[in-house]
Amino acid sequence: MEIWLPPSEGKNPPGEGPSLSLSALSFPSLTDTRKKIIDACAQITDEEQAHQIFNASLRHSAELEANQALMSQSCAPASAVFNGVLFDALTAQEPRAWIGEGSQHITIFSGLFGALKPTDLIPLHRLAMGTKLPTLGNVTSLWKSVLGSALAEDYSEKLVLDCRSSDYKQACLAPWAHLWEVRVERLRNGKRSVVSHNAKKWRGMLSGALALRCGGIENASDLEDALAEVTPKLRSRDARGATSHVKEIEVSPAKATSQGGSTRTLTLVTVEA
């Protein structure tokens, strides 16, 4: 099984490290598109324009500055650069997920690089999927034209735990894979509602719990067995101090896709303890 993640908006600036080497990144067939996007980012030098295009605030000044010279920036592993809710939860659940065998089964999608492995060395940057660059147009559309064919080489017919957000799903619909899209709901007073922000934390915890098991999960039955074992152990504490756990899991029937793959929805039904 593979695990697909979105990037995080929050990032840790790399300290001292090597500069960006596109030829060293995973999925080398994406190199030309990466170069085009990096060049397009470098052309946006007006500060006000950059804040508008990259949907940035003052706290993103370092990221916007890095965008103008990405090839010369210091780099660190992608798993260390991204530091949002999902990544923090995954690391807390299973720190070993980012190294060794666990990392081999994780792919991080990116507006700047298309797709990455956790060990790929990348710089500080800011470019979300869905951004419209003046010289290239919508980044999602650009990646959609190349990501599918590039990733099919490695992931055709593979089982994928899909934790991506909508923009990153649109960049690669992957009709050749068997996607399990993760949804999180809250049960309260007998009614269920969709969890939005805290869903990132649940997806991170679930990914961490399964990361080291990926090599042994070959089909839907294997995944259901693994879920039955790991989900009862997951716990999330919110800002109020309330702790939630997974009451039940639901798996929708598989829907066949046009290129031999399928999609399902995996729903974690959570409840406060």
In which residue ranges do the predicted regions lie?
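Internal, well-folded beta-alpha domain core
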Residues: 93-273
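Near-N-terminal "mature-domain entry" segment
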Residues: 1-127, 131, 142, 212
